[in-house]
Amino acid sequence: KTSSASRSKTDEDRFTNHFVSMKLPLVHGTSGSFFALCSGSQTPVWEQTTLKESAFGSISPKGIALAMDLVEKHTTFQDVWAARDEAVLAGLAEHAPGILEPLAKMGPDLWSVVDRLPRLGRVFFAAHLRMPRPADAVLSGWHAVNCLREWRGDTHWALVTAADLSGPAPSILHNAWIGYEKDWLATSRGSTADETAAAWDALEARGLAADGEVNASGLDLRQRMEDETDRLTALPWTLLG
């Protein structure tokens, strides 16, 4: 039986190969594909630096700029978007074949919900809405779910902002809440060692960490943000019925 870890590694390798084939160099052990995919729906407005720095949450603005530059030099955002769609269909067929038919059938109802959600303050959600909706029924259903995910994510980041967390600090709290290896998430999102160290100092100054570890207060804040995110993002499921 294949373990979830080995499946994830296989998926990562397959996904990375898509971007290597487009001559996208590897960054921090992975491709710049994550930044490129997230931003694909927002180009060309991302040429404005302030948007790059404000909409990606705890992802390093420098990493975002690097990924943008790599895409512009070696491929197009449309090709990156298409490669992701191809990988999604292949991954669903291989790892979750049982949801293909339900996802295709639910697509129209999901889009009906998506179209009724408020857009104010939801940058990624609104940007994804401007992208063409796939003709493939399965992929269309997946894109609708992805829009719901982005709507939740935008809502969550509003709460992170309200908690006065910025830079690598949200990644540090989330990293501890999930139980990842220390500083893995901040590093994977492009933060430098100095930036991460400064974030630790800021968290300790607020009583959210001590001696290089997120403490109970920090974990409680992260849990409260998650609970409030759940409360504020119940609307799609209420509309779906």
Regions found by a protein language model. Name each.
Residues K1-A197:
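Phosphate/adenylate-binding glycine loop and adjacent helical scaffold
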